[in-house]
Amino acid sequence: AILCYNGFGVSRRWFAIPQDAGKRPERKEDFHFEKEPTNFKIDELILLCEYMENLLIAYQYIPLNFPYGYGNMRPQFINVQFYLQQIGQVIERIGYMQATQNGFTIFVEKSPAAIAVAESDLVPKELSYRIISYNHYSMKGQLEAKKSALVQLASLLEPKRGSLKKADKTLESDLFYLFNNLNIRHNNVDPADSAKYKPFIVQMKQEELEHWYDETYQMCLLAFLQLEQTERKIEFDRLKTAIEEQT
C-alpha cells in the first residue's frame, strides 16, 4: 500500500508498506520513499487521513486517570492540533471536505451541488450527512447503500413533486421514472409482479446499474436546487414588486 504523510514528519514523501509487513519483525528495507509513486490511489490517502483524524480526536478524550504517566496528568505525547491542521491542509489541497456524524469523521470530494442541498432548508438534518456521504469512496460498489439513500431522497421529493413539475416538467418526469423503474422504490426484478417487473433491469450489469444510481442521485440534487430556486423566485418577485411600486 502506498501512503502519504504530507506534513506528518516525512516532508511530502511517499512510502510503501510490503504486503507481509506486520507478520514478521520490521526490517529497514520494509520502507522506502517515493517522490512520485507509480501506483498511488487517492482512496488510500483518504483512508489514512480518516484513520489519523479519528485517532487524534479520540486521543483528546482519553481520561486523565488512564494508567500511564504520573498521577492523573496525561503526558502530551502528541501535538493533536498540529497534526489535525496538517490533515486539513492535505484534504483542502486535493479538493476534499470533512463530514462528521456521531463523532466519526469522513472525507469526501467537494461537490458544490451536494453541499448546497445538504445545507438547504428543504432537507432535514438527519439526511444531510447521507447526501454528502453518498460520494464517499467506501460507497463504490455498494448498490444497496446507494439504493437506501435514493429511497430516502425519493420520499422527501414525493410531497414536492407537484412543485417540481411546475419548475421543470422534464426533470420531474425523468427522475420519478428512474425511482419507479430502476429497482429503487419498487421491486422491478421479481417476475411474479408483472406490473413492476422490468427484464432489462434484471439483465443489467451491476456497474451499469450503479452508474444509473449515481445519475439518479445527481438528478435528485438538481431537483432540490430547482425547488429552492422556485422559492427564491417567489421572494424575488415580491422584492421586484415592492421596488417598482415606489418607482
Per-segment meaning from a language model:
Residues 151, 162-247:
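Alpha-helical oligomerization segments
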Residues 1-84:
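Charged interaction/catalytic cores of defense and host-pathogen modules
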Residues 50-130:
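Helix-loop junctions and short alpha-helical segments
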Residues 127-146:
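A long, hydrophobic alpha-helical segment
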Residues 55-58, 137-141, 163, 185, ...:
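Surface-exposed polar/charged interaction patches
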Residues 37-40, 72-75, 122, 140-148, ...:
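Conserved aromatic-histidine-acidic binding/catalytic patches
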Residues 41-48, 148-152, 175:
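Residue-level detector of well-ordered alpha-helical segments, enriched
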